[in-house]
């Protein structure tokens, strides 16, 4: 797997681990309130605190799965699937919460998914005989 894609996946996993930290470890802090644009007093409500902590565990799960897909499974398909899921969730959040979520939570994932597709296209071109194979080989050699 491409080192650039691995770096992007690590950054995405770190972002989701940080969200876990905010939502589960310090769910009613001033930092969490600032990041999510909420009042601390609202975050201290037991139902809200429980919901935040639960959501944080899901975010940690995404981070762990992404790291496993990259470094244990070495699966481009699993990575692409997780990135697509992250983008879908960010898109949903941009419609329901704030339009900027697609860039804040999904921006790195969008770039990483584009890298996945670019790499797949180059691999297909390289596997084909003829001019496309030579072009892809040339591009790969220049990296």
Predicted regions and their residues:
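A charge-rich, low-complexity, intrinsically flexible signal that marks solvent-exposed coils, linkers
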Residues: 5-8, 30, 69, 77-78
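Juxtamembrane transmembrane-helix termini
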Residues: 22-32, 72, 96-99, 103, ...
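Transmembrane helix-loop-helix
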Residues: 67-91, 95-107
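Juxtamembrane loop-transmembrane helix junctions in multi-pass integral membrane proteins
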Residues: 3, 43-46, 50-53, 73-77, ...
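N-terminal signal-anchor transmembrane alpha helix
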Residues: 3-27
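Intrinsic-disorder-associated, low-complexity terminal segments enriched in Asp/Asn/His/Tyr and depleted
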Residues: 127-128, 134, 138-141
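Core segments of alpha-helical transmembrane spans in multipass integral membrane proteins
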Residues: 15-18, 22, 34-71, 84
């Amino acid at each position: 797997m491409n080192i650039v894609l691995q770096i992007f996946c690590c950054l995405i996993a770190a972002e989701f681990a940080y969200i876990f930290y905010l939502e589960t470890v310090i769910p009613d802090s001033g930092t969490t309130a600032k990041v999510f644009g909420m009042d601390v007093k609202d975050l201290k409500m037991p139902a809200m605190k429980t919901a935040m902590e639960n959501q944080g565990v899901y975010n940690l799960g995404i981070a762990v799965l992404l790291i496993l897909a990259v470094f244990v499974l070495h699966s481009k398909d699993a990575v692409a699937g997780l990135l697509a899921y992250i983008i879908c969730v960010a898109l949903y959040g941009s419609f329901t919460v704030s339009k900027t979520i697609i860039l804040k939570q999904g921006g790195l994932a969008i770039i990483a998914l584009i890298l996945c597709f670019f790499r797949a296209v180059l691999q297909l071109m390289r596997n084909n005989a003829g001019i496309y194979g030579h072009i892809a080989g040339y591009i790969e050699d220049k990296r």
